[in-house]
């Protein structure tokens, strides 16, 4: 199965790196995965914490869409899932 390599997430990791801007954990490997409802596979980037737990790396909106942020590479940053959930729809300095 082919995987499209032009997603916003992949572009974010390629241009801005694979390290969470908040906690500094770094994505180490991609896993080919498929959501139960999806028709095609995608790659998820994972970091591994000191206890060996996998942590999904995400594309965060610096200015959340709910606050007027745009869907553009200039408004994206790499962030681990835990930090992204904690940030929610806030704007950090």
Report each predicted region and the residues it spans.
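Short Cys/His-centered divalent metal-binding micro-motifs
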Residues: 28, 72, 76-93
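Residue-identity detector for threonine
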Residues: 12-15, 58, 90
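Histidine-centered nuclease catalytic patch
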Residues: 27-76
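Short, charged surface segments at domain edges that flank catalytic/cofactor-binding sites
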Residues: 1-45
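Generic structural signal for short, solvent-exposed loop/turn connectors between secondary structure elements
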Residues: 1, 68, 92-93
